[in-house]
């Protein structure tokens, strides 16, 4: 498989596949990177259908692990905007694949973009609920978060006051892109009710894997993911 590694405005990027007029932007999830297993599978399936794939590292991930820029929503949305602007200059038809929090950043960054199709794996569609769940689990009040600004949780995730404020001030209220969602019934991060509400509100096709988790990583889960891609990449 042809792979070209380069940087777009200092964002480490991989372009997968031979030259084409069609491309998927691939946005990875938390604790992942631009060469994650699901992105490799996406590239394999998309290339078969005549697409290229552009994947990149979010702040604090992959080649950017040691960067000073934190993986905060405002920086990630900015990076996604840089990527889509580059892509629109070089390709005629743009589609989107996003996983977990990568889907959330995409919902914010790409709501006004001309994207033909979106494929979401285990998408985060309500970040405010996830942050508030974490605050509840670890007995962190909004007042304490505001005072301390940054709090490290026992599960290794940092909570930021400015991140929380951004999320509250920028709700997901627009999404008109033709979207397919693959969700695991055993997802411990995103409740089914929230995903289902989003899917119905924005007319997305939702497929649920009974033995799927938030992180698709077993052979069975990745096989289902691959079959789902084969069905929905036209």
What is each of the regions a protein language model found here?
Residues 31-43, 193:
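The serine-hydrolase catalytic nucleophile loop
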Residues 30, 57-67, 124, 212:
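Short beta-to-alpha linker loops that shape the active-site pocket of alpha/beta-hydrolase fold enzymes
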Residues 61-90:
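Catalytic nucleophile-loop/oxyanion-hole region of alpha/beta-hydrolase
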Residues 21, 28-33:
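Active-site glycine-rich loops that stabilize anionic/oxyanionic intermediates
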Residues 38-39, 43-65:
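Conserved alpha/beta-hydrolase
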Residues 1-19:
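N-terminal cap/lid segment of alpha/beta-hydrolase-fold proteins
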Residues 98-106:
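Gly/Ala-rich beta-loop-alpha elbow adjacent to hydrolase catalytic centers
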Residues 113-197, 201-208, 212-234:
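The alpha/beta-hydrolase serine catalytic core
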């Amino acid at each position: 498989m042809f792979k070209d590694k380069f940087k777009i405005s200092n964002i480490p990027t991989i372009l997968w596949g031979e030259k084409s007029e069609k491309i998927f932007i691939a946005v990875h999830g938390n604790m992942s990177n631009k060469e994650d297993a699901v992105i490799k599978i996406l590239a394999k399936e998309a290339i078969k259908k005549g697409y290229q794939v552009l994947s990149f590292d979010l702040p604090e991930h992959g080649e950017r692990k040691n960067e000073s820029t934190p993986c905060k929503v405002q920086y990630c949305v900015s990076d996604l905007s840089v990527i889509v602007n580059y892509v629109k200059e070089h390709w005629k038809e743009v589609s989107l694949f996003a996983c977990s929090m990568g889907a959330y950043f995409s919902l914010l960054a790409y709501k006004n973009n001309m994207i033909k199709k979106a494929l979401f794996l285990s998408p985060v569609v309500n970040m405010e609920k996830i942050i508030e769940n974490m605050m509840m689990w670890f007995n962190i009040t909004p007042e304490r978060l505001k005072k301390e600004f940054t709090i490290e949780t026992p599960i290794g995730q940092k909570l930021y006051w400015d991140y929380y404020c951004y999320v509250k001030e920028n709700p997901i209220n627009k999404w008109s892109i033709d979207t397919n969602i693959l969700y695991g019934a055993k997802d411990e991060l995103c409740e089914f009710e929230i995903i289902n509400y989003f899917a119905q509100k924005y007319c997305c096709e939702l497929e649920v894997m009974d033995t799927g988790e938030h992180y698709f990583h077993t052979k069975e889960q990745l096989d289902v993911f691959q079959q789902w891609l084969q069905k929905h990449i036209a």
